[in-house]
Amino acid sequence: MLIILIIGLTGLTFMAWFLIRSPKLRRITGTVTLLLLASCIGGLSANLAVHWGMSPRTTVQTTHRIYSAGPSTIPNNLLIVRRLGTRSQNYVLIYRTTATQSQPRPHFVPDRKQLATATKKRATFRRQAVHRPSVTTTRREWVFKSAFYARLLTFDHNNHQLISERTTVTVPLSWRVLTTQEARKVARQTPQ
């Protein structure tokens, strides 16, 4: 809506300054439309720069249980991890999402086509004294403060814009956490 107002006010400002013949009416109309145009541009710039009209919202979601990445012949439950980068605490985690799933799958693999979004997402793990493993996702995003701001500033799907997303997989102390290299060694040693 604000972009449409800017386009319309640009045309009105042009017409006010160049097409109105009366000097007094031209100054008043031209100044008013120019001030309205400047305020619309300022509002759009403030929204793009400092998210004017928006507020951060945090949602925490504890989702499904997870199941061991190891074969059923191994007595311990396994979580296989692979660190992304050398110093980051960001991981690709390999586990099963259902007990009947035949092969474990990697989760939290960054999307190389959406790098701006991928850099805002992190996944890690921790071992704690819990009974069941779980996945907890904390998501922070920009949302409009009211319907007025949403109507005024919505363009390019900027509502629910991601600030950060942190996912933590919590496993019991009885689980073994292995790197991908360690998991390969265990797989070679395990009888089929």
Located regions from the model:
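Extracytosolic and intramembrane catalytic regions of membrane-associated proteins
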Residues: 89-192
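Transmembrane alpha-helices and immediately adjacent membrane-cytoplasm interface residues
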Residues: 33-56
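Short extracytoplasmic
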Residues: 67-91
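Membrane-embedded alpha-helical segments of integral membrane proteins
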Residues: 1-23, 27, 42-46
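Membrane-interfacial entry segments at the cytosolic side of transmembrane helices
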Residues: 26-34
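Alpha-helical transmembrane signal-anchor/signal-peptide segments
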Residues: 48-73
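Generic structural signal for short, flexible, solvent-exposed coil/loop and linker residues
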Residues: 55-56, 73, 82, 158-160, ...
